[in-house]
């Protein structure tokens, strides 16, 4: 297999192990309304999805306007940033891995369901923004993961064929999204087990032992 045309990264749970803090933020959001959110419900209904889709699920059966979605999103994400600010750090091995990709002249992009404020928050705390030639976020798509739209849009903006790209994901909807776009997928087990992510081409605990040659070997041997 030749070098990938691009390496496309999800953000939450893939480049930072922050899903425990998203869970805490959503639980605080729920508690304000006298409700309870379990970790199982988070993994099944929230992780990897856009805030618009999540808010519609949280308030299923209730009338929800775009203004409501924006207000609830701001509330929850402010909680998340307040909770996580003192703890944010990259997944082990991320920075050396980005350096490797850069040294091989592989374009690097981000395709995240997250909002711009959270992406800026990430870049402020983790100094990797110069590696990324493109960032596509959840406000730029109509259909969230597991729909392939965000990955096909990212490839289109990069000017590359999706089937020549490798995506890095941590969630089941994210893996499904990248696969549906025709990409090779490397899953990171920060949130889900290897068994839950078994549809991916390769599964890793973090980026610490990954090399470009090893990545190619992993995704070729499926």
Residue ranges and their predicted role:
Residues 1-5, 95, 99-102, 115-222:
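Asp-based, Mg2+/Mn2+-dependent phosphohydrolase catalytic module
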Residues 2-95, 99-104, 129:
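N-terminal helical cap/lid subdomain that shapes the substrate entry/recognition surface
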Residues 13-14, 83-85, 110, 138, ...:
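Short, contiguous strand/loop micro-motifs
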Residues 15, 44, 90, 108-111, ...:
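Conserved SAM-binding loop
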Residues 20, 112, 121:
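Conserved catalytic-core motifs of eukaryotic protein kinase domains, centered on the activation segment
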Residues 36, 107, 184:
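Residue-level detector of anion-binding/catalytic polar loops
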Residues 84-89, 113, 180-182:
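Short, flexible loop segments at the rims of nucleotide/cofactor-binding pockets, characterized by
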